[in-house]
Structures are given as structure tokens and as C-alpha cells.
Amino acid sequence: IKIITREKTLGKNFFFANEPGQVSFEEIDYNQTAINKALSNYDVVFNLIGILAENKKSKFKFVHTEIPRMIAKGAKINKVKSFIHLSALNINVIKDSKYALSKYNGEVELKKEFPNSVIVRPSVVFGKGDNFTIFFSNLSKFSPFLPLIGTPSIKFSKNIFKTFNFNKKVRFQPVYVGDLSKFLIKMISKKNKTYEISGPSVKSFSQIFDLILEQKKRTRIYLPLPFFIARVMAFFLELLPGPLLTRDQITLLKYDSISKKGLSNLKKVISNPLSIETVLKTYL
């Protein structure tokens, strides 16, 4: 097993239940020549590369579109038997997000090079070290407020009155990283398929915050944050290195990340997928 990365030192943070020498890390620059060489003599390739926000070194188009295309081409050249690509839920229907567009274009490009590839589109992924539950848990350490982004929903019109809907909430169907990993392994035998994947429970921001705060034994105030206010805040946060929130992420949050079909797909492989309620207490 070989793990390809741009930063080999990150391998020090991983621990594997394997014999010495069975897992190795290889540091490469992401260009076609290097990728072709790295994939030589391997039967199965997983592409798990992705970013949530752009910076000077990493742009959505390169990471989500160009790299998958190069990996798919390298897999074809090396006659790889199976190529599994990790994408994201609903990117095929979201048209106003740079993240979603780059992800979807990546799917299109890799299919041109490796038509038998398997694409997996999960909802929000949670587990030890994630960028979702851990972020809000850490935020609750020092902030008395937790943001309910997208609540209330506000409809603007020509009239002086506007519609405020506090019942409109962004919904997620989080999938446990352990279940997702098992699902990906089972995809090795599949050809030319696309699967949505989602967990067993649908949660709003406030319900996820409830679980986090209950586990950490904290009390915080939930602050309603309509999208237009969140976008203004994100604009200023983007001026900082490593922004906590971006306008493109706000755009993504306009769309629910849920899928009944996704849960059905997961249950075909994992009979009893773990819920966020069950797993959260094991790592927070």
C-alpha cells in the first residue's frame, strides 16, 4: 500500500495495524509524469484529495479538476484495474459554487480518461480529526455563541415587508468516516458506477450543536445568521490566512446535504451504519 502526498512528514500522524513495510508514503509534485510513475505496478487507486477553501498554493480547479484527470490518465496508462474517486454529495445540482463546479468538472474529466471509474459522493463526513464537529467543538471553547448559518431564511421583495422563516434550516446527513472507508473498499470490484452516500440521521446545525455541547457539558447561545450577513462576515474572514469561513462555503450551505438514496446505498454494504449520536462521544 502506497500513500501519495505532497508532504511526506504528514505520515508521522498516521498509525496502521500492519506489518512493517506494508504501508509507505511517497512525496511527489502533482504533474502527469510524477503521477504516472507513482501509479506504476498498482492494481487499485483511491483519490481522496480535496480542499474546502482556496489559498495561494491550492486552487479548486487544479485540486478538484486537474488532479483527478491526471490520476485517471495515469491509471489508464498503468492499466490499473480499479479507480475509486471520492467526490461530494449534490455537486451535480449546485451551479453557483466554485467548490461544487470544480468537483463536478473533475468527475467529468476523469470519466473521459477512465470510464470504468467509481465515483462516491458522501454527505458531510465526521470522525476523529474531522473539519466539521471538531471545528465547532473548538469554537465553543472560547465563543459564547454558535452560528446558525442560514437561519432565518429571508425573502426580499419589492414590498417594504420581507418574509422571515425561522423554520428553514440547513440539513445534513453525516456519514461516519469508518463506514465510508469500508464502503470505499467494497467499491474495488465495481465498474463505472456513481454512488451517493449518507448516514442514518438527518440533522440541522442546532441539533449537531446540541450533541457537541451535551458531550462537552457546555452551554452556549445559538446565534441566527442569515446568509447575507454570513457572506459579509466571510468576506472579511477571507482576508486572513487560513480563513475559518469563505463566501463559497456559505453558498454551499444554501443546499441541504441529504439523500435517502445515499443511506440505502450505504446499508447495502454496512448493515448498521453508525450515527453521529453514537460516534461523537468516542472522540470529542
Task: Enumerate the predicted regions with their spans.
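Mid/C-terminal beta-alpha module of Rossmann-like enzyme folds, strongest
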Residues: 180-246, 259-284
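A short helix-to-beta-strand connector/capping loop
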Residues: 18-25, 114-115, 218-220
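N-terminal Rossmann-fold cofactor-binding loop
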Residues: 4-9, 28-30
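Substrate-positioning beta->alpha
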Residues: 131-132, 153-188, 193-196
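NAD(P)H-binding glycine-rich loop region in Rossmannoid oxidoreductase-like domains
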Residues: 19-70, 74-77, 89-94
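Conserved Rossmann-fold NAD(P)-dependent oxidoreductase catalytic core, especially the SDR/UDP-sugar
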Residues: 52, 62-113, 117-123
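Short-chain dehydrogenase/reductase
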Residues: 61-65, 96-107, 111, 126, ...
